[in-house]
Structure formats: structure tokens, C-alpha cells
């Protein structure tokens, strides 16, 4: 157990801030409950629902960058997860990338990944991670080491900028780099841009070529700082100071490559003083305004599989929407066209216990939450143009590894279903269904939770329509009348259903497919039909237009 009197004075604020943020200490006292759900009172069947769709009304264009993720030098996310160079039990690519993990990530169909943090980014000096390995010194994780070796182990710097780009090329994903604002300088950031994007005639482009990578990487997305509004953060400052310093970074970085997109630190109403001065001072140089959200905003010893906790967690999606709307309004208060500076929700997840940083179990409940969050991202497609699940491997993870094996959890499957099947344009739709009142829980406001969620998308040619229905009822199916205007579907509809044996089902190494996506078919000879969405399921109905 840590004792504050034993902590060196210069680290006291950092540790206090971490504890303030996590509201938990020490790590080893917490247990996660994975038992059978307790018996709940029998509930009546919900009334049949209705979905009405008008394919002639396009409500927004969905940016594929909402299907993104995030990796940080923390726990076994990168070292011991994605990059495992000393592991002789698994096949490796490029001397360190785990092939089984790479295959899992490829199948996820992500569009973008952010690196190297997170809080870690504001302590990371990129030059320590380039060149021959023998020149790269092992480092202490300056921020996360206070939470012990499971969360903040030392790292050997063998996964640096070039290894990150090898990783990106292997999975075919857009890179997003967060520079060191907290302990770095504009000059250091500009040199990193030159190393990644400069041609071989430049000083740092030549260094990249010397390290074996002649062709520029052309990294487009660059973040300046991480959660600088927070007292836990290296570089913590007032919004006015952050904005002025942001402009110094932006000027230096764009002098090297004027075509890069810059992401500024934003916040929701918990830091309501933040966005206005940042936008007023630096708005002309901001490509995206970021903000982070972890729900339910309540740290617990355990989270049961009870029906009430099922609805407590799923209701978090609507708290996220409430906060997105607040951020949208904070932008439009300064910049009349709120779409001019879109939102990058570049960290989101469910997080209720510190153990999830190294023991990442998620149930079908959490997959339904993730699906409900994507429903909301689609609904706000005109403003939310980037969203990154945090994080990809082993830390609050979509993918979990041990030294010999890998599995994915229900949140992974929800991301995969949306990223694979949803189309580009959001179509007008309305849902008529029963709701359930859920009381306030942690930071989640009370809400009348619709049992049925829905997102309807169509491709540019308007010949492929995808209806994604989310049955948020813990035990009952929902028969649903679906009516589609201006689209005559072929009689056979492909169905992709994410589900498991109960709302508390989860995957593990010895039962990797308890929760899975199953492909089915459905027959209908009309644009008006009834489909029954199974209990606790996410279902994509893929319809093709009759020729």
C-alpha cells in the first residue's frame, strides 16, 4: 500500500491527481463479480415497436474516422500486447508485432488509431524511440508508474515512430499522433512532423531514411496535448494559456507540413470554462476539437450482472449524447457554423474499476452500450467526425492477450458490426417503442431509455440499405413493424446478429465465442415487413435494391 508521506515531494501532486481522477487506492483490494445474475421479478412483454424509414431524406454523412481506436504505452497495451518481441510462443511480424493480434485488428475494420497516448504522450520524447535498438534506452513510465508495474511498467522504447507505422501499414489504418505538449516544445513537435512527413532532403527526413524508411509516412492527424484542463495532466494549465501555447505548436508544425490536421484539447460541461477561450484564441488553427468520456463516471469495487446494473450501464449512452450536444453548443457559441470545427471524441469507453486497466472483461451488456454509442455517433454525424475507442489491446480493451493466445470481447464485436456493415449516409428514420425509466447513476442522468435503438444508413448509389436495430431489453424480444419509403428491396435480406446466451454473457480464452456475430437470412417480398429483434441483441439487416 502507498503512503503519501513516503512519496517524494516533487511527485506528490502527480500522485494526488491520479488518485483524484481514479478515486481508488490501492489496486489489489478490488474484485470483479462475474457470477450468475440474481433473480429479478418477471417483466411483461414490451409492446410491438415500429420503425419508419424515408430513404429520400439524407440527414448526414458518416465519417469512417468514428470507427477508430487508441493505443498507449500503458499496461500491456503495446509492450506485451501488440508488440511482443521476446515472446517465442507466437508468430511475430517485423520482429515484434504479434500476428494473432494483427489478424484480430484487421478483422475489426478500423479507420484510424491514435498513439502514443493519452497522458503518456505528454511525457514522451519521440527521439528516444528511433534508430537501432541498442541505442534506445529503457525508460520509466513517468506518469503511470505510480499505479504499479501492472499499469505503468518500464518500457524499452523498441516500439517507436517507425514501428508504429509498420503496425499501421500492416492493418491498413490511418495514423494519428499525439505530440508531447506537457513536457515537450514546439520545436520537438515540428521535428517529429518532419521525421514522419519530410522528404529525404530535410534534416529529419534524412534521419528517417537513414533508419531504413526512405518514403515519407505523410501522417495527416496530429493532436496537441491531452486533457490539459485536468490537474493530473503534465502541462495542466488555464485554457487561455493552453490556447496561446497551442498556436506556437501549430505554427511550428505547419511550417513543416501545412497540410496536416490539428486536434485541440476540448472538454464537456464538467470543465465548462474551457472551450470558449480555446476556440476564441486558437479556433482558426483547429481542425478538430477533442473531448474524452468514460462512463458511468463512478468507480466501484464490483459491478453486478443484475438487471438494474444492466440498464444503469446502457443508459450511459444517452449521457454521452447529452455531453456531445453540450460540446456542439459550446462550439456554435463561438463559431456560428458548428460543423466548421467537428468533434473528435478521441477517447471513449466504459470504465468503472482500475482492474480493467489490466484485467479487461466486458459482457454483452457492454457490447450493447457500445452499439448504442455508435447509434448516437450516427445521429450526430454532421458534427462527430472522429471517435476512438480506448483502448485497443489489454487496457480497457477490445482485444485481450496472454503469452500464447488472444480473444475479443463484445465491445469489439459491436465496433466490428458497425464498421463493417454501416453505410456512408444516414437516412431519416423514426422509432416508436416502449421506454424504461432509469434513475441517475454516477454521472449518468436519469433517462427514459428506449428499449429499441436504430440507425439506418445507405450507400452513395442508394442500392444498399442497412438497418441496425439494438434491442436493449434484458430478456424479451421486440416484434417490430418496419416500413421503408422509396426503396424496393430484394426478397432476401442478409442478417448479422450480435448476441449471446444472456445479457451477462462474456468471452474468455476458454470460451471465445459465447458472444458472437451470426449470419442469417430473412425473406420478405415487400418494403413493409415485421422483424423480431431478439433480446439483448444488435442486428444489422442488409437490404439490396431490386434491379
Language-model-detected regions and their locations in the chain:
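Non-catalytic accessory regions flanking glycosidase/transglycosidase catalytic cores in CAZymes
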Residues: 15, 20-275, 279-288, 320-547
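Active-site His/acidic residue clusters
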Residues: 293-312
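Active-site-proximal helices and loops of the catalytic beta/alpha 8
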Residues: 296, 316-317, 321
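Short hydrophobic targeting helices and cationic amphipathic motifs
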Residues: 3-4
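Extracellular loop and loop/strand-boundary signature of outer-membrane beta-barrel proteins
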Residues: 311-313, 361-362
Amino acid at each position: 500500500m502507498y503512503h503519501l508521506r513516503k512519496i517524494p515531494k516533487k511527485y506528490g501532486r502527480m500522485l494526488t491527481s491520479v488518485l483524484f481522477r481514479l478515486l481508488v487506492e490501492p489496486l489489489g483490494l478490488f474484485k470483479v463479480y462475474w457470477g450468475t445474475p440474481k433473480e429479478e421479478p418477471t417483466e411483461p412483454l414490451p409492446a410491438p415497436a415500429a420503425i419508419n424509414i424515408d430513404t429520400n431524406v439524407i440527414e448526414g454523412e458518416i465519417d469512417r474516422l468514428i470507427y477508430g481506436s487508441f493505443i498507449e504505452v500503458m499496461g500491456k497495451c503495446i509492450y506485451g500486447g501488440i508488440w511482443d518481441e521476446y515472446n517465442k510462443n507466437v508468430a511475430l511480424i517485423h520482429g515484434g508485432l504479434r500476428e494473432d493480434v494483427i489478424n484480430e485488428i484487421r478483422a475489426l475494420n478500423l479507420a484510424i488509431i491514435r498513439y502514443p497516448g493519452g497522458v503518456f504522450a505528454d511525457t514522451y520524447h519521440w527521439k528516444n524511440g528511433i534508430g537501432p535498438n541498442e541505442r534506445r534506452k529503457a525508460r520509466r513510465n513517468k506518469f503511470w508508474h505510480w499505479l504499479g508495474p501492472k499499469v505503468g511498467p518500464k518500457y524499452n522504447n523498441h516500439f517507436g515512430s517507425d514501428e508504429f507505422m509498420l503496425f499501421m501499414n500492416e492493418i491498413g489504418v490511418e495514423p494519428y499522433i499525439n505530440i508531447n505538449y506537457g513536457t515537450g516544445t514546439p520545436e520537438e513537435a515540428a521535428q517529429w512532423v518532419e521525421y514522419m512527413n519530410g522528404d529525404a532532403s530535410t534534416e529529419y527526413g534524412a534521419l528517417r531514411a537513414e533508419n531504413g524508411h526512405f518514403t515519407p509516412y505523410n501522417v495527416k492527424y496530429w493532436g496537441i496535448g491531452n486533457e490539459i484542463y485536468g490537474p493530473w495532466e503534465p502541462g495542466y494549465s488555464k485554457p487561455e494559456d493552453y490556447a496561446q501555447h497551442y498556436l506556437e505548436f501549430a505554427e511550428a508544425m505547419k511550417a513543416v507540413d501545412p497540410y496536416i490536421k490539428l486536434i485541440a484539447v476540448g472538454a464537456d460541461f464538467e470543465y465548462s470554462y474551457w472551450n470558449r477561450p480555446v476556440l476564441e484564441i486558437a479556433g482558426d488553427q483547429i481542425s478538430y476539437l477533442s473531448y474524452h468520456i468514460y462512463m458511468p463516471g463512478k468507480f466501484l469495487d464490483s459491478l453486478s450482472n443484475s438487471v438494474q446494473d444492466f440498464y444503469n450501464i446502457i443508459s450511459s449512452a444517452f449521457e454521452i449524447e447529452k455531453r456531445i450536444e453540450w460540446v456542439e453548443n459550446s462550439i456554435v457559441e463561438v463559431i456560428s457554423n458548428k460543423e466548421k470545427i467537428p468533434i473528435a471524441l478521441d477517447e471513449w469507453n466504459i470504465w468503472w474499476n482500475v482492474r480493467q486497466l489490466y484485467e479487461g472483461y466486458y459482457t454483452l451488456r457492454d457490447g450493447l452500450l457500445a452499439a448504442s454509442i455508435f447509434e448516437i455517433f450516427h445521429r450526430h454525424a454532421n458534427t462527430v467526425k472522429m471517435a476512438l475507442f480506448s483502448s485497443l489491446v489489454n487496457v480497457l480493451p477490445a482485444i485481450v492477450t496472454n503469452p500464447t493466445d488472444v480473444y475479443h470481447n463484445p465491445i469489439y464485436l459491436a465496433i466490428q458490426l458497425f464498421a463493417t456493415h454501416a453505410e456512408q449516409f444516414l437516412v431519416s428514420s423514426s422509432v416508436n417503442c416502449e421506454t424504461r425509466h432509469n434513475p441517475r447513476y454516477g454521472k449518468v442522468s436519469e433517462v427514459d431509455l428506449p428499449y429499441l435503438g436504430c440507425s439506418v444508413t445507405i450507400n452513395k448509389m442508394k442500392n444498399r440499405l442497412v438497418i441496425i436495430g439494438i434491442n436493449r431489453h434484458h430478456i424479451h424480444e421486440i416484434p417490430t413493424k418496419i416500413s421503408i419509403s422509396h426503396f424496393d428491396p430484394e426478397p432476401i435480406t442478409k442478417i448479422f446478429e450480435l448476441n449471446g446466451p444472456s445479457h451477462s454473457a462474456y468471452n474468455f480464452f476458454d470460451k471465445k465465442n459465447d458472444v458472437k456475430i451470426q449470419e442469417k437470412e430473412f425473406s420478405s417480398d415487400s418494403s413493409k415487413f415485421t422483424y423480431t429483434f431478439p433480446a439483448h441483441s444488435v442486428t444489422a439487416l442488409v437490404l439490396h435494391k431490386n434491379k
